[in-house]
From Swiss-Prot:
A single GO molecular function term of this UniProt record: RNA binding
Source species of the chain: Homo sapiens
Biased amino acid composition, Basic and acidic residues: 109-128, 139-160, 289-306, 335-353
Protein name as it appears in the record: BUD13 homolog
Any one GO cellular component localisation term in the record: spliceosomal complex
One Pfam match: Bud13
PANTHER family: BUD13 HOMOLOG (PTHR31809:SF0)
Predominant subcellular localization, coarse grouping: nucleus
Entry similarity comment: Belongs to the CWC26 family.
Covalent link Glycyl lysine isopeptide (Lys-Gly) (interchain with G-Cter in SUMO2), residues: K65
Post-translational modification Phosphoserine, affected residues: 28, 127, 139, 151, 163, 172, 175, 197, 201, 214, 222, 226, 235-236, 240, 248, 258-259, 271, 281, 325, 354, 357-358, 391, 407, 567
Length: 619
């Protein structure tokens, strides 16, 4: 077999690219064929030329080419920080649950899936049971989780459930088959659970089309901390799960078709909840028997009239009930209607600590059932109406002997007694003469007092001095005002004298001169009269005309009286700069205090100047 001619890289790439364009899916097969048909070096030994074929597989070429392209593109792309998933763990688990194919989701992919519908899973088979499609029931259904169910847990009933109200079905047996446990032979309908929480959706209506099954409702009191029990596969209880407190046969159950013609009891509303057919909690008995049946008060009177009444109770949605007022307090015929009742077995019926509902109004022993009925007494009307009377209970008139009225006692006058006093204060009835005279005297004294008060109500107050004479306040006020004025004038005069008359006059003259100068323009010229007069009157030393000026002044002031003034040598300075009298002979007769003061001021000023010069010496 002849050796295949060697291929150049360009031809090899051309063949490879044409093969890639023809079909990508056949790339692996062609690669294998090429590897099988790889040209072998011809001959053994050193004959001819040894060709080393740089055969690279198409996968390696494609990856290297893509890596090169990615490296080239990465230079143009912006740098992005690494994405860090900071979502909570619940959201991640929910996303993993939805994205995985292990679970079969029912309905829409919303987060409310666990609370939409619940199915019973009694076997390991995870396929859902048959769903009821008889009525558009979007409310949550309870499911049995006897096996480890990986589905999300159902929502509790003590949380607000926004599901709408169900309409009751009035057909005798037209509903689709119920969901029945596969390991149970119980034919009784599911019991209605009680929800004391603000759940707007009422519980499902039990269907009473089964023979010999009375409508039992299981109470779910919210104060009861015990969780609902789950029945097991091997449970001997073949009835649907109910919450009971005794294992003995329940003697309080009664079929509707029995000869007993008693009405179904109506439980009173503990709260103004108008949701139809919502049962309320009842007080438990001490003997451990728990009430198993309680009908809603909002439904009408349920009567037993034969087998035709075996259907479930009517829904108040379809029956007119005009009475939506708050619950009325029923009145008992006996004085002990509100006291605690003792049945024939001596069981004192009280509300236990776990049952926090308000106690019901107990009826008298005459209205209670037989000893076999261990359910708590219900509120009943005092007069049993006929079977045709379906009207709501009327408001009963209050009897005088009823102790059930919890309102406080009224303040009323005892019968046969009238008010002892009238509005004016006088006594009623026959009054003795002494009492009448005393009342008259008191009335006269009151009238005199009132007249005296009216007379001196606006009178002026009379003030007297120590001797008892009346004081004229107006004159006293005038005298005080005059005296104050005189004192103020004298104080001003003494203040003026204390400051000095000459100083005050000079100060006043200076103020006048300053006001006059303020009226003149800012620039004064040579032709200013005041300025020329002031310069002429000045005496200058060495002036040859000084004597002539003095003579002229003396002639001008000859007719004017001028006080003589000291004209000798300069006197020593004083604090007030006062000149001595014209008769002073020039001898200093002081103790030298003024001289010392001026010397002290001069030395202080010299020291300050020397200190300043020393501080700025180096500058």
């Amino acid at each position: 077999m002849a050796a295949a001619p060697p291929l150049s890289k360009a031809e090899y790439l051309k063949r490879y690219l044409s093969g890639a364009d023809a079909g990508v899916d056949r790339g692996s097969e062609s690669g294998r064929k090429r590897r099988k048909k790889r040209p072998k070096p011809g001959g053994a030994g050193g004959k001819g030329m040894r060709i080393v074929d740089d055969d690279v597989s198409w996968t390696a070429i494609s990856t290297t080419k893509l890596e090169k392209e990615e490296e080239e593109d990465d230079g143009d792309l912006p740098v992005v920080a690494e994405f860090v998933d900071e979502r909570p763990e619940e959201v991640k688990q929910m996303e993993a649950f939805r994205s995985s194919a292990k679970w079969k989701l029912l309905g829409g992919h919303n987060e409310d899936l666990p609370s939409n519908r619940h199915f019973r899973h009694d076997t390991p088979d995870s396929s859902p049971r048959r769903v009821r499609h008889g009525t558009p029931d979007p409310s949550p259904r309870k499911d049995r989780h006897d096996t480890p169910d990986p589905s999300p847990r159902r929502a509790r009933h003590d949380t607000p459930d926004p599901s709408p109200l169900r309409g009751a079905r009035h057909d005798s047996d037209t509903s689709p088959p119920r969901r029945i446990r596969h390991d149970s032979s119980d034919t009784s309908p599911p019991r209605r659970a009680r929800h004391d929480s603000p759940d707007p959706s009422p519980p499902r209506r039990p269907q009473h089309n089964s023979s010999g099954a009375s409508p039992r409702r299981v109470r779910h009191d919210s104060p009861d901390p015990s969780p609902p029990r789950r029945a097991r596969h091997g449970s001997s209880d073949i009835s649907s799960p109910r919450r009971v407190h005794n294992n003995s046969p329940d003697t309080s159950r009664r079929t509707l078709g029995s000869s007993d013609t008693q009405q179904l009891r109506r439980a009173r509303h503990d709260s103004p909840d108008l949701a139809p057919n919502v049962t309320y909690s009842l007080p438990r008995t001490k003997s451990g028997k728990a009430p198993e049946r309680a009908s809603s008060k909002t439904s009408p009177h349920w009567k037993e009239s034969g087998a035709s009444h075996l259907s479930f109770p009517k829904n108040s949605k379809y029956e007119y009930d005009p009475d939506i007022s708050p619950p009325r307090k029923k009145q008992a015929k006996s004085h002990f209607g509100d006291k605690k009742q003792l049945d024939s077995k001596g069981d004192c019926q009280k509300a236990t600590d776990s049952d926090l509902s308000s106690p019901r109004h107990k009826q008298s022993p005459g209205h209670q059932d037989s000893d076999s009925d261990l359910s708590p007494p219900r509120n009943r009307p005092r007069h049993r109406s006929s079977d045709s009377d379906l009207s709501p209970p009327r408001r009963r008139q209050r009897t005088k002997s009823s102790d059930s009225d919890l309102s406080p006692p009224r303040r009323s006058q005892p019968p046969g007694k009238k008010a002892a006093h009238m509005y004016s204060g006088a006594k009623t009835g026959l009054v003795l003469t002494d009492i009448q005279r005393e009342q008259q005297e008191l009335k006269e004294q009151d009238q005199e007092t009132m007249a005296f008060e009216a007379e001196f109500q606006y009178a002026e107050t009379v003030f007297r001095d120590k001797s008892g004479r009346k004081r004229n306040l107006k004159l006293e006020r005038l005298e005080q005002r005059r005296k104050a004025e005189k004192d103020s004038e004298r104080d001003e005069l003494y203040a003026q004298w204390g400051k000095g008359l000459a100083q005050s006059r000079q100060q006043q003259q200076n103020v006048e001169d300053a006001m006059k100068e303020m009226q003149k323009p800012l620039a004064r010229y040579i032709d200013d009269e005041d300025l020329d007069r002031m310069l002429r009157e000045q005496e200058r030393e060495g002036d040859p005309m000084a004597n002539f000026i003095k003579k002229n002044k003396a002639k001008e002031n000859k007719n004017k009286k001028v006080r003589p003034r000291y004209s000798g040598p300069a006197p020593p300075p004083n604090r007030f700069n006062i000149w001595p009298g014209y008769r002073w002979d020039g001898v200093d007769r002081s103790n030298g205090f003024e001289q010392k003061r001026f010397a002290r001021l001069a030395s202080k000023k010299a020291v300050e100047e020397l200190a300043y010069k020393w501080s700025v010496e180096d500058m």
